């Protein structure tokens, strides 16, 4: 068993509070004015699914102070689609091109002298739509008569993986008790104090595009934005401000706007600034994936779990956008949580619907996993007439088993799960709660007690990327190497001698 840490479980004094509380933070909107910068407003689709028939930009361009308009037609001509980690031919651009596939999808950008003019001018821009049938449920999206979002794909199934560890069929054949349950995990969002922000400046003489943005983890997406805009990596500069006003994972999905505002700067020839407003953020920034899942548990009558089967349908919205399908696979190493069962089958479907796009958000994928697993632990306890805490205790990895290798490849280096559970029960006065629950229920009152155990991945070293990607993508340089270290550097030299340092 590994030595206890001198840091874990200890109060650590915060060092940033004084600077932030006295107004000395430096966020994207505080960036020193870029000379001759103009402001952008984004026109968004009011339809969940609609074919774009055309644009009328004359009234917008005629307004005083308007510098230019970028439409989906311009995006289609000037940009390549973003790379995605599946083989399905899904063409995801910085804005809608042929059709809009979710409410709030960008369809045009208006650049003007200030944000007020840009917003007013955007109201005068006319987009002609042909509304189409929409589908928002991931199971219904796979039915034969469901509207197809991407005709080139021919289905709304963006990807599918089946992973088998150990001998799940043998575990279920041996089981004395089998339980099956359906779960629905809702789409969810977070609201950081600071919304998205992008400032882009194009230097036509040197061919250098500089982008300032409150992007969480910009280096991962640098090659993708470079490819989309056709700007060499060594000519594309990403600069992150000293402070970011919250993210919860959401700001890792800002990169389509880096490309869109970058294109606006390149097309108009002036620096362009865009700060997302709260309505835009709530409508179309990035949300957590909603899921429909089926779980099966094979167990003995004493509560010992022999194996599980996972089957889920993850709803990624109108397109699959990197780092999706990470929601299905980020917790791969800890699929079994703190429990010692060795047999597992995972059947994961990634489905496109006419909802807004998804990405990292508040624990990215882990909430789904814990909700389902812990729900099954409670149902097993109820089936067997055992206390929910006791069922969990009987299946925990013991301290003397650590370090422990999970069947899915995770490595648990240290911990004492039984002790941690007991500490939580003692602090909550669990036995007293159960007695109070019994009394309340005898009186006809509701009295619930919830338990949940989790082993949460922190630095994953990006190992789940190899699981999420189709095999032909796994060794490509834009995806690998990756480092899970808090600090790392990668230097690439291409055949022409151009150096890219990340």
Please annotate each region the language model reported.
Residues 42-72, 108-128, 198-268, 325-334, ...:
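Alpha-helical support elements that line or immediately flank enzyme active sites
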Residues 16-22, 85-86, 155-198, 290-375, ...:
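Glycine-rich loop/linker segments at domain edges
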Residues 88-112, 116-117, 248-301, 358-383, ...:
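Glycine-rich and small/hydrophobic secondary-structure elements
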Residues 235-242, 269-279, 306-311, 341, ...:
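Beta-strand segments within the central parallel beta-sheet cores of soluble alpha/beta enzyme folds
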Residues 197-203, 207-209, 215, 224, ...:
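Non-catalytic terminal/interface segments that mediate subunit docking, oligomerization
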Residues 1-159, 178, 257:
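Flexible, low-hydrophobicity surface segments
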Residues 79-84, 121-124, 191, 213, ...:
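Short acidic, glycine/serine/threonine-rich loops at helix termini
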Residues 67-80, 160, 411-441, 448, ...:
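Amphipathic alpha-helical
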């Amino acid at each position: 068993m590994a030595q206890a840490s001198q840091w874990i479980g200890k109060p650590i004094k915060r060092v940033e509070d004084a600077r932030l509380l006295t107004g000395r933070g430096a966020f994207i909107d505080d960036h020193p004015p870029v000379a001759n910068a103009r402001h952008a407003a984004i026109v968004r689709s009011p339809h969940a699914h609609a074919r774009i028939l055309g644009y009328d930009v004359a009234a917008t361009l005629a307004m005083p102070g308007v510098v230019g308009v970028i439409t989906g037609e311009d995006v289609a001509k000037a940009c390549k689609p973003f790379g995605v980690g599946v083989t399905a031919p899904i063409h995801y651009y910085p804005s809608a091109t042929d059709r809009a596939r979710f409410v709030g999808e960008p369809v045009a950008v208006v650049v003007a002298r200030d944000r007020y003019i840009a917003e007013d001018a955007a109201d005068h821009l006319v987009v002609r739509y042909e509304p189409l049938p929409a589908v928002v449920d991931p199971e219904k999206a796979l039915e034969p008569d469901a509207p197809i979002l991407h005709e080139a794909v021919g289905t709304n199934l963006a990807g599918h993986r089946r992973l088998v560890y150990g001998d799940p069929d043998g575990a279920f054949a041996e089981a004395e008790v089998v339980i099956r349950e359906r779960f629905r995990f809702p789409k969810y969002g977070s609201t950081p104090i600071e919304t998205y922000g992008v400032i882009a400046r194009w230097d036509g003489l040197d061919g250098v595009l500089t982008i300032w943005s409150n992007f969480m983890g910009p280096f991962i997406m640098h090659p993708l934005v470079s490819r989309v805009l056709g700007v060499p990596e060594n000519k594309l500069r990403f600069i992150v401000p000293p402070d970011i006003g919250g993210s919860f994972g959401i700001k890792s999905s800002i990169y389509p706007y880096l490309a869109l505002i970058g294109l606006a700067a390149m097309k108009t020839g002036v620096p362009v600034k865009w700060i997302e407003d709260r309505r835009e953020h709530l409508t179309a920034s990035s949300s957590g994936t909603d899921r429909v899942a089926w779980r099966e548990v094979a167990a003995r009558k004493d509560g010992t779990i022999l194996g599980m089967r996972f089957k889920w349908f993850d709803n990624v919205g109108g397109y699959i956008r990197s780092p999706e399908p990470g929601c299905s696979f980020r917790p791969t190493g800890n699929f079994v949580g703190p429990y010692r069962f060795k047999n597992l089958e995972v059947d994961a479907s990634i489905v496109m619907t006419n909802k807004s796009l998804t990405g990292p958000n508040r624990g990215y994928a882990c909430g789904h996993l814990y909700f389902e697993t812990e729900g099954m632990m409670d149902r097993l306890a109820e089936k067997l007439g055992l206390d929910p805490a006791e069922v969990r205790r009987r299946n925990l990895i013991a301290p003397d088993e650590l370090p422990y290798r999970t069947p899915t490849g995770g490595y648990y280096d240290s911990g004492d799960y039984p002790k941690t559970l007991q500490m939580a029960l003692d602090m909550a006065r669990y036995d007293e709660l159960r007695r109070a629950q019994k009394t309340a229920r005898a009186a006809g009152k509701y009295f619930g007690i919830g338990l949940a155990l989790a082993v949460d991945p922190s630095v994953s070293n990006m190992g789940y990327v190899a699981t999420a990607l189709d095999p032909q993508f796994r060794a490509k340089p834009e995806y690998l190497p990756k480092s899970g270290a808090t600090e790392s550097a990668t230097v690439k030299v291409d055949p022409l001698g151009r150096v890219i340092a990340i």
